[in-house]
Amino acid sequence: LGLERGRRKGVLIEEEDGRTSPYSKGILAQRLMVSGISRDKAYEIARKIEEKLTSKGIERIKQEKLQEIIYETIKEEVGEEEADRYRLWIKIKRKKEPIIILLGGATGCGKSTIASELAYRLGIRHVVGTDAIREVMRRILSKELMPFLHESSYTAWRAIHVPIPPTYDEMIVGFEEHAKHVVVGIEAVLRRALVEGMNMIIEGVHIVPGFIKKEFTDLPNVIPIILYVEDSDEHKIRFYARAQEAPFRKPVEEYIKDFEAIRRIQNYLVRQAEIYGVPAIKNESMEETVERIIGIITERLKRLV
């Protein structure tokens, strides 16, 4: 009985439809990170809000009133811009439109790492790699029928068996042929996500600006972004680093052997991004990259509200 008396009661949040849910610092902190607030600061704010509620003896609070407290606390602790961004995300969530992020970039630029962190911060459960889509398509379409599909993005030029004009870059021609087949699968996944209302991140080298139909990329809730690593030495180091973290991947020598092709593909993707007005972000720091992407997503989603 003594334990029961000493146990602190949680705060219940009353929703508009009458349902209640317990106040959770973890859930609120995750939502605050969407506003571009750092992880540590988000948890600090969530803790301070809980302390405000419990110090006043509040055991139940309406969602609307709680949102006012959250807004004012963010404004006090971080600033009005972040507070306004949080309020915008609440409005977006009520719209119930799926958010789909298309994250492209050359091999080794950090797409998977950034996609995982974005998924965590935005509460997105579905992350699809375009390599997985390519693998499914390889199972269906034979090498004889689709030779480019059965090469890697940076070795697809080896499947060229007809002369090409000398002014063309065969590595890019091969990559384009390879990517355009995978884009068919990407669009199928995109369409399904939109119909079923699934928040999703699709990441991979096959996200090429200009290749995915405008009927998708013109939607405010479909957000294409390209990542790149500017320094070639830094790019090369990343292959050695990920070989340590993920030993099941190809041997690092495989990537280094075709490093020139990987860099050419990166330059091509950045040029395509410039042509089609797609944001291209230099991926140097995970924290800075994620914050920039969240800022881009927020600006784009303003069109929904």
Where are these regions (language model features)?
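Loop/turn-to-beta-strand initiation segments
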Residues: 125, 195-202, 221-223
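A glycine- and Lys/Arg-enriched "phosphate-lid" helix/loop adjacent to the NTP-binding pocket
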Residues: 220-265
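Glycine-rich phosphate-binding P-loop
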Residues: 101-122
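Conserved nucleotide-sensing/catalytic segment adjacent to the nucleotide-binding pocket
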Residues: 139-198
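Short beta-strand-centered segment that lines the nucleotide-binding/catalytic pocket of NTP-utilizing
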Residues: 124-140
